[in-house]
Amino acid sequence: MNPNRSLEDFLRNVINKFHRALTLRETLQVIVEEARIFLGVDRVKIYKFASDGSGEVLAEAVNRAALPSLLGLHFPVEDIPPQAREELGNQRKMIAVDVAHRRKKSHELSGRISPTEHSNGHYTTVDSCHIQYLLAMGVLSSLTVPVMQDQQLWGIMAVHHSKPRRFTEQEWETMALLSKEVSLAITQSQLSRQVHQQQVQEALVQRLETTVAQYGDRPETWQYALETVGQAVEADGAVLYIAPDLTGSVAQHYQWNLRFDWGNWLETSLWQELMRGQPSAAMEPMAAVQSTWEKPRPFTSVAPLPPTNCVPHGYTLGELEQRSDWIAPPESLSAENFQSFLIVPLAADQQWVGSLILLRKEKSLVKHWAGKRGIDRRNILPRLSFEAWEETQKLVPTWNRSERKLAQVASTQLYMAITQQFVTRLITQQTAYDPLTQLPNWIIFNRQLTLALLDALYEGKMVGVLVIAMDRFKRINESFGHKTGDGLLQEVADRLNQKLSPLAAYSPLLSRWHGDGFTILLTQISDNQEMIPLCERLLSTFQEPFFLQGQPIYLTASMGISTAPYDGETAESLLKFAEIALTRAKCQGKNTYQFYRPQDSAPMLDRLTLESDLRQALTNQEFVLYFQPQVALDTGKLLGVEALVRWQHPRLGQVAPDVFIPLAEELGLINHLGQWVLETACATHQHFFRETGRRLRMAVNISARQFQDEKWLNSVLECLKRTGMPPEDLELEITESLMMEDIKGTVVLLHRLREEGVQVAIDDFGTGYSSLSILKQLPIHRLKIDKSFVNDLLNEGADTAIIQYVIDLANGLNLETVAEGIESEAQLQRLQKMGCHLGQGYFLTRPLPAEAMMTYLYYPQILDFGPTPPLPKVALPETETEAGQGNVGDRPLPNSLNRENPWTEKLHDYVLLKERLQQRNVKEKLVLKIANKIRASLNINDILYSTVTEVRQFLNTDRVVLFKFNSQWSGQVVTESHNDFCRSIINDEIDDPCFKGHYLRLYREGRVRAVSDIEKADLADCHKELLRHYQVKANLVVPVVFNENLWGLLIAHECKTPRYWQEEDLQLLMELATQVAIAIHQGELYEQLETANIRLQQISSLDALTQVGNRYLFDSTLEREWQRLQRIREPLALLLCDVDFFKGFNDNYGHPAGDRCLKKIADAMAKVAKRPTDLVARYGGEEFAIILSETSLEGAINVTEALQVEVANLAIPHTVSGTGHVTLSIGIAVYTPERHINPNALVKAADLALYEAKAKGRNQWLAYEGSQLPHVDGEV
């Protein structure tokens, strides 16, 4: 080791370089330069192996006065024989060769001496060929260190010296750690290269999109796009072929950097076959890039990749020439020497629109070899010459994985752009239109849907497919004839187009499907919730009557919806699933819409399962209340709400009330459910009042079973008392038919309710058989007009007369009327003219969840349809004093809304999508938060913990863990976040053969697993047992994959009940998977680097033999303590110790015994100098030093005597010594540091004391203190 270069300086310089923006070659050069200076040798080089076994010197630091430079030279595979590669790669040994003595010593790459060599004096013989090889290089000492990467031998780091030299244990370990630093630098370089490749890919996609969007379908557009792709992929030439389309346009081709015209050549059968991606079975093209994107249930890839159809195929000219149908190319092709072709079909979903062909010329590769071959007999092993010579190799260039992927991405963009132009042209052709409705037909819809699927693949958005069919349209044709029916379909098409025209943001496409069916394509969809208002907008098309032969006809329609990528990934599957959802909508009463669910393909609902689930629904808190506002029709003011119960099934989603209410009555559960509704409604009423200061009438429906229960009345009164709700704010709704079952009992019960202040309304009035005389006896407040009458209100028939009669009757009895199911402005205006008091329905506002209802109470102006007064400014008080001035209910909270107000249309989106937007906001914040933590912290534990904590909080699930695989594909839970219900499973090791056999392969492919109910899922029994052991009812598993290596799994557990995982849950974890994988890899990389640096720091301050401080640590500690004690005016004591007659000990017992002796003495010193501020160091050879801070002379003498006792107790035999055992001589110096005195004065004084102690006869000590210190040249 260079005595003028401390290990600390070396370490500091190496570490600092890793924090700079250096290329891999620059980083390697820094390492070899610093290593050569530190070791004090003539050459340090880093040598990388090529795939053929040869290698190249990538970095070198050399003393040219002693050895020649080898930088950039290639060495043949024979120069490192298989035996050497075995030792370096598989056994991972570092090998030092002593050429002069023809021997070698090896250490494990960990830095430890291997046991087999320890027993053999560390050295073994070296092959004579290798000795002569090194001598020819001018090398007398060498150290070869393997560099590993991904468990493979990447290269070597070689140290050469032109003189004999021994490498110390410290140098061995230092070089082992430097090898680790090189491996980390290589990994970091690979990571940077991947990031750069991703940036290039994104930039290319952006340029292509911009070019096509800006210039459209022009030759200049395609020519520029082709040139852009060719340059990005680093091709020497390129051809873009655009096939004929359905409009009859001829094929087109564009070419870049080619001299001859490819037009006729591309029309040959061979090139048509190659361009369509259908090579002959006899040909074996280069392996294509595998890329899949499967839907998230049950497995899906972590991130969307390009479609499998646009797969590049690589060929060489030699392979093509072997084809029997090969036609010799024009002379110019041969003259330009094109030898390699990458052909990418522009195709997706079996629709081929053209091809991209990339070409590369034959390359000349110049290599400089170390030593001539063949003609120079000196190169016969052992080699005697390393004179450089130049070789020019002719290579057929290949296309690597990243270039293939880039070509695939570019081809997909070209496919989408060309297909878009095809669609544009097709739309202008009559063949693309339905002759009846003049809408695009199935040809356009299929092509546009395929294009939208590809676009969504890269945008990260959803695609929606809607199939609409008229309800009972067959009766129209039968009653009025097909000609009239055709005219009606034309009017339906016009209305649908009008409804779609404001939805340009979704790029809607309406097409005629077949019969009375239409299809609609919507793009840029974020999730299913976003589609709900769009579907309702479309269904509102049928609220106004159609007129046939002067007669108004009311039509209804049903709609089925499927979405990509979650329901399907092809046009065929999406249309199939949308039609299945349409069937479900028709089965649920028509005039509605339904989204496709996987269970739709099977029988809709398993009654036995539904019964079982319903019994648990209350316990599991699966019921929720929605609130539909009741509005005064003359003023638009909000007067009350009706509480409506909804069942949020964990697997089936929302189950319709007409399904579960009759079932609850049949199972005897309706009383419990009804009581829950009452309790929740009253409690929510009070919550609304506390938060907004507004009192509303809360209407609650009562079932027949409840009404007939003798205890029911008391339960109502107790509920009011318990919740504190004023009785006059509660309205109980009973049906007309229920009232007639026991009229006397009903009258008595209703009188009791009225006495308590509770209001009563008769629901569905007009559908039963109550008489006027009975009605007069009932103490009721309101009559509710059934929705069935309101639906036909505008026909001016019997239903209109019934409604007018009910209103007149209510007025005569001094009752209010409430109209249900108002769904159009015309209905609203007609009811206003008829004198109806109150109304509710979708036209006013749909039922709202509690949080959305709260928003409505704060801002009721958003839903008003009355006059348009100036909107008052609502200034909330800033202080409690201001808040106390006046009644809360008197605040100027506006409660009128004009439907012409620009906010009107936006509120429906707000109140219904509020929860989804909140989730999206949380999701975006979570992704940003985790990304920021990744950038802010490189601590692997922080990264892991923040990931599971934030994901569990977002998903609101019971447990989230990170599971890490080991080399045998078992593993351990390394971190977790869980609630109190779930037991902790952190550090649990899982080695389950069932898991390995059934699911490991899928996770290694990067697929996601979502299981909503493990008991009903198609899982192996052994896997179910494993999940039950961990209390799991439902789980969501995302593989953590980096650089195609599976690190582990990010797993979410639901432990109480099954859970249907929403699409956004999957999307969140899929988005996070890549971020987590990169973060973990960076954290582990940093952890490895820190470990290596800490070890370097340790060996830079510890003596390799005795493991006490070394000379460097002694010098730095002495300087530091001298400065500290100078400030506090405390003494510093120094003991210099020397083993007596140690040379004679080595000569008599041997050097290994001498090493063991020094280690025992160092251990004895550590026992007596044990304060935190004390330091024991090996000063050199058999000399040791002990620094004792804040220690007087008396204290130093005590330590000295204790040390002599400890050494005597060791009883190490020493026949040459006068005492018969090993002893120490000790020199002591004690001084209180002063600014004008150099600490070296203390060292020299202790050294003089040691010299005098030895002169007294060994095993003695002598001390100097303060003014007694002899004069030395130590003053500053």
From Swiss-Prot:
Region annotation (Bilin lyase domain 1) ranges: 1-197
GO-annotated cellular components: plasma membrane
Protein name (Swiss-Prot/TrEMBL): Phytochrome-like protein cph2
Keywords: Chromophore, Photoreceptor protein, Receptor, Repeat, Sensory transduction
Chain residues that bind a tetrapyrrole 1: C129
A single BP term in Gene Ontology: red, far-red light phototransduction
SMART domains tied to this protein: EAL, GAF, GGDEF
Molecular-function GO term, any one: cyclic-guanylate-specific phosphodiesterase activity
Lineage of source species: Bacteria, Bacillati, Cyanobacteriota, Cyanophyceae, Synechococcales
Originating organism: Synechocystis sp. (strain ATCC 27184 / PCC 6803 / Kazusa)
Keyword Repeat: yes
Processing and modification events after translation: Contains two covalently linked tetrapyrrole chromophores.
Job description of the protein: Photoreceptor which exists in two forms that are reversibly interconvertible by light: the R form that absorbs maximally in the red region of the spectrum and the FR form that absorbs maximally in the far-red region.
Region (Bilin lyase domain 2): 939-1075
Record InterPro entries: Cyclic-di-GMP_PDE-like, EAL_dom, EAL_sf, GAF, GAF-like_dom_sf, GGDEF_dom, Nucleotide_cyclase, Phyto_chromo_attachment
Domain EAL: residue ranges: 607-861
Region of interest called Disordered, as start-end residue ranges on this chain: 879-899
Listed NCBIfam families: GGDEF
Domain writeup: Both bilin lyase domains bind with the bilin tetrapyrrole chromophore precursor. The domain 1 shows red, far-red light photoreversibility. The domain 2 is photochemically inactive.
Domain GGDEF, chain residue ranges per copy: 461-598, 1130-1266
